[in-house]
Design a protein with these regions (language model features):
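Nucleotide and nucleotide-moiety/phosphate-recognizing core
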Residues: 1-168, 179-182
Length: 182
């Protein structure tokens, strides 16, 4: 995309960035808010009162390293993970996912069009050894965890009750996708 997506403005509110919106939303629902930054330069852009920032243990490896770094840094038993390029996460969906009963070692992953939405999911801290093993095997994509860790999927019909347009899963990766939000 050529620029830090976290600092792009939200549709309908040019004064609020993706990261500001997500931090505000997560602070309402979660006991701890942690941002995982790619590197020190990005971390400097993510200073918010009461929010900790950690840096990828090995920059440039991808989302799986981000998850590993985040799970290593949290003080809670699980993390609600939201990618910064999902700027339209709905509060009702977030609350619904967080309210789901879940065994302590199980991932909670929404399904949209039968595709696992690993960038908006709940990950238990207890899977750190599994994540580490996947990294050591050269894997970088969060989807690899779906084959090696216990997973509870949330069906689309349940998601639609809390996010009728499934806006929460709109991923912004290109300037065209960002402009399409407006």
């Amino acid at each position: 995309m050529g620029k830090n997506k976290a600092l792009l403005s939200l549709p309908g509110n040019q004064a609020v960035t993706f990261i500001e919106h997500l931090v505000s939303l997560l602070e309402e629902c979660c006991s701890e808010t942690l941002i995982v930054a790619r590197d020190q330069a990005h971390a400097q852009d993510y200073v918010f009162p009461g929010v900790r920032v950690t840096i990828d243990e090995t920059p440039g490896i991808g989302p799986l390293m981000g998850l590993y770094s985040g799970l290593s840094a949290i003080h809670t038993t699980r993390a609600f993970v939201v990618a910064v390029d999902l700027p339209c996460v709905q509060r009702a969906l977030l609350s619904f996912l967080l309210s789901q009963p879940l065994p302590t070692d199980t991932l909670l992953v929404p399904l949209v069009h039968n595709i696992p939405q690993v960038l908006l999911a709940i990950y238990p801290r207890s899977i750190l050894p599994i994540v580490r093993e996947q990294l050591l095997q050269g894997r970088h994509d969060l989807r690899c965890l779906l084959k090696v860790a216990p997973v509870q999927f949330v069906e689309e019909v349940q998601l639609l009750q809390n996010d009728p347009q499934l806006c929460s899963f709109i991923n912004v990766n290109t300037p065209e996708e960002w402009r399409g939000l407006f």
